[in-house]
Amino acid sequence: MSAVLPASAMRRVTCRELRLLGAAYRLPLAYAAARCARETKLYLHWTAGHYGQFFADYHVQIDADGAIYVIGDGALDALHAATYRRNSGSVSIALLGCVGATTEDLGAEPPTAAQIEGLAMAAAALADGLWLTIDKERVLTHGEAADNEDGVRVHAPYGPRTTCERWDLEYLGTAESPVFAPWAEDGTRGGDVIRGKAQWYRQHK
């Protein structure tokens, strides 16, 4: 777990502000990604900490009430240690919470409905600003990235389909994504649900 930040280090933003930040950092992120022979990515995480507890490793953070925060001035090209061997040219978005989560039980501080919607709205806003298609190749959970499900093979797999070292957001504990099922193809995996919601917000903004 990374360094905890005080609330005073964070700035609450709207989706419009997040979209503008994405546009402002579109080229720097694209250049950084190109140097690694890949496209700009959005990686979706949970912090494995508590609601209201901010961390230094994530560009965008979403609290239990769905409020969206950035660190300081929101520098999206800051290199944070969020996603192993994938941090250059990427933006990390994290839900605050999920301390003690297991593949059987998401614990006392699971993703809230407001957080899930906030995450989808944040992903849609950033994808708009960065000119990204919302698909698994560009917008994916840490668990999906850990198993190289986007086809970018920069490390050995360590996600929910293999070692389960990282499985962030593989399931959400909701009716849409009720259980840990990393091989599911019915749209119930957490990443599929979040991308679907992000697409909806993109179309209805």
Predicted regions and their residues:
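Basic/polar, cationic surfaces and motifs that engage anionic cell-wall
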Residues: 1-36, 100-205
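N-terminal catalytic cores of peptidoglycan-degrading enzymes
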Residues: 1-87, 156, 199
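Structural preference for beta-strand elements that scaffold enzyme active sites
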Residues: 41, 90-92, 138
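A mature extracytoplasmic/lumenal domain signature
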Residues: 48, 74, 97-99, 143-145
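Weak global preference for isoleucine
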Residues: 62, 68-71, 93, 116, ...
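Short C-terminal domain-edge/linker segments immediately following a structured domain
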Residues: 72-77, 91-92, 124-129
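Short coil-to-beta-strand
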Residues: 85-97
